[in-house]
């Protein structure tokens, strides 16, 4: 305050992903379950963000560089994978803002012993594929099952949801230059 920085300084509090303390039978992190998937992000931007406001749009750590560049008035390179959050921070979420997240964890076998997996998370659903020495799919309805304890992948009531998520997952993998073939290329010999 003494130097007036409280009037023109953006303050951001973010964290690494959450850490399991026995949820789902695990310790550590890296899994796609909400306990380690969701991370805090608090931003104060004097004169721009309304104090005390809350936004639930899907943002990602890959959006931070683009956001910082736009805040600084620097042109964002077109080959970056994230999107600037500035419109959201100003209370004007773009109509084409993401409705899902893509996640891929490659480091198995390894010291953490977290199985290789990738998936898609939407506001209501999460589809996860475990691979390498297994081939297992999981689907969670986060509104009906917020703790993600009941896998409904084979439940006939979720057939259309499952098919839709598979299509969206394939589209995201292409968007980010990922594929099952690429994932398999990381497997040890």
Predicted feature residues:
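Structured segments of extracytoplasmic/periplasmic soluble domains
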Residues: 2-3, 71, 155, 168-176
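Short acidic-hydrophobic sequence patches enriched in Asp/Glu that either
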Residues: 33-37, 57-60, 77, 81, ...
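Histidine-centered active-site microenvironments of extracellular/periplasmic hydrolases
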Residues: 1-53, 60, 111
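Generic structural marker for isolated residues within well-ordered, non-membrane alpha-helices
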Residues: 65, 149, 169
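Intrinsically disordered, low-complexity polar regions and short flexible loop motifs
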Residues: 145
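C-terminal cap/loop subdomain of S1 sulfatases and analogous C-terminal strand-loop tails that border
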Residues: 17-23, 62-65, 70-138, 142, ...
């Amino acid at each position: 305050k003494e130097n007036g920085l409280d009037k023109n300084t953006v303050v951001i509090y973010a964290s690494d992903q959450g850490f399991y303390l026995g949820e789902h039978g695990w310790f550590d992190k890296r899994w796609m379950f909400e306990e380690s998937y969701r991370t805090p992000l608090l931003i104060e931007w004097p004169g721009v963000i309304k104090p005390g406001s809350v936004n639930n749009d899907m943002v990602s750590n890959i959006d931070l560089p683009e956001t910082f560049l736009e805040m600084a008035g620097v042109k964002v390179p077109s080959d970056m994978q994230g999107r600037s959050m500035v419109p959201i921070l100003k209370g004007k979420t773009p109509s084409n803002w993401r409705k899902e997240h893509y996640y891929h964890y490659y480091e198995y076998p390894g010291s953490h012993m977290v199985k290789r997996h990738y998936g898609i998370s939407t506001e209501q659903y999460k589809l996860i594929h475990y691979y390498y020495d297994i081939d297992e799919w999981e689907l969670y309805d986060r509104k009906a099952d917020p703790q993600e304890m009941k896998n409904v992948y084979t439940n006939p009531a979720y057939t259309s949801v499952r098919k839709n998520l598979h299509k969206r997952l394939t589209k995201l993998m292409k968007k980010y230059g990922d594929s099952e073939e690429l994932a398999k290329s990381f497997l040890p010999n």
